[in-house]
Amino acid sequence: MNDRLITPDASGEDEAIDRAIRPRRLTDYIGQPVVREQMEIFVHAARGRGEALDHTLIFGPPGLGKTTLAHIIANEMGVSMRQTSGPVLDKPGDLAALLTNLEPHDVLFVDEIHRLSAVVEEVLYPAMEDFQIDIMIGEGPAARSIKLDLPPFTLVGATTRAGLLTSPLRDRFGIVQRLEYYNVADLSGIVKRSAHLLNLSIDETGCQEIAGRARGTPRIANRLLRRVRDYAEVRADGHISGEVAHAAMELLNVDRNGFDEQDRRLLLAIMEKFDGGPVGLDSIAAAIGEERGTIEDVVEPYLIQQGYLMRTPRGRMATRNAWLHFGLNPPRQPDTSPDLFQDAPPVGRER
């Protein structure tokens, strides 16, 4: 389990709070302007025709609101939503039970859809295309296949790893939306809205202080808001100002770039112990006492995305941004250009 404060993965507390503060309509949805405008058009058009919305794939890094957008789609269409995840649907019968209980135009939301098994995918193809499923009745020589008609429905799939989707499944989605990391202004608006729903007192500088350290991720912003709330109630008068938020973040070891202690240890190890790299992952793991898998899957992605770390064929390297962030001078690169005036071979005499 990942217990980092700035992890984008959801905890039990996150899920409970998210349900309470989740926007219900596109008008309440902050950020992702292109996605919001496109979905507004698609939803209104489908509603106007009295049809189910096209099957929709939502992908992007964790914590950006894929589940929230699925709920909004169902609310905007005025239908119910059934929610499940790829690993849960391990048998075709599990999927068939869900599909046959849907009402016309309902939304079936499948999180981690890239983890569907091949046999379940085979059942899903005719369901998505023809709104029919084939079910086997009986066993052995007496077994026979029957077709069941399904009501028109919308499959909304969410994934953090769109590249792992099979081509036949990906091609059956009529709408594909990618969620991008949020800018500080949008995150500040999300923090302000969440604080209002949680009855917290906060000013603009407090919102910006939290938003700037949230790594572009609403889930992290809301988690930091709750921890700053705790600090404000115990160490201040309950109001979250810029100064209070800054003091809380310093206590929590989250700096202005959203780095925590693990991020700083990794970058400093590469710069101070390995002259900025390149250095192999196993050497880094030994230097900071962390598991290779944790570094690769948990710590590195954000540092690479933000331009502080590079993966090269020879290993990891700290970028110029990393040296500047810590106020360190990068080592001088050796000059490998040839010297035209030294060690030149003797010129023979002309005859």
Swiss-Prot record:
It is found in: Cytoplasm. Signal peptide: none annotated. Residues 256-351 are annotated as: Head domain (RuvB-H). Residues 328-351 are annotated as: Disordered. Its EC number is 3.6.4.-. DNA binds at R292, R311, R316. Keywords: ATP-binding, Cytoplasm, DNA damage, DNA recombination, DNA repair, DNA-binding, Hydrolase, Nucleotide-binding. Its main location: cytoplasm. It catalyses: ATP + H2O = ADP + phosphate + H(+). Residues 1-182 are annotated as: Large ATPase domain (RuvB-L). Gene3D superfamilies: 1.10.8.60, P-loop containing nucleotide triphosphate hydrolases, Winged helix-like DNA-binding domain superfamily/Winged helix DNA-binding domain. The RuvA-RuvB-RuvC complex processes Holliday junction (HJ) DNA during genetic recombination and DNA repair, while the RuvA-RuvB complex plays an important role in the rescue of blocked DNA replication forks via replication fork reversal (RFR). RuvA specifically binds to HJ cruciform DNA, conferring on it an open structure. The RuvB hexamer acts as an ATP-dependent pump, pulling dsDNA into and through the RuvAB complex. RuvB forms 2 homohexamers on either side of HJ DNA bound by 1 or 2 RuvA tetramers; 4 subunits per hexamer contact DNA at a time. Has 3 domains, the large (RuvB-L) and small ATPase (RuvB-S) domains and the C-terminal head (RuvB-H) domain. The head domain binds DNA, while the ATPase domains jointly bind ATP, ADP or are empty depending on the state of the subunit in the translocation cycle. During a single DNA translocation step the structure of each domain remains the same, but their relative positions change. Homohexamer. Forms an RuvA(8)-RuvB(12)-Holliday junction (HJ) complex. HJ DNA is sandwiched between 2 RuvA tetramers; dsDNA enters through RuvA and exits via RuvB. An RuvB hexamer assembles on each DNA strand where it exits the tetramer. Each RuvB hexamer is contacted by two RuvA subunits (via domain III) on 2 adjacent RuvB subunits; this complex drives branch migration. In the full resolvosome a probable DNA-RuvA(4)-RuvB(12)-RuvC(2) complex forms which resolves the HJ. This is Holliday junction branch migration complex subunit RuvB. It comes from Alkalilimnicola ehrlichii (strain ATCC BAA-1101 / DSM 17681 / MLHE-1).
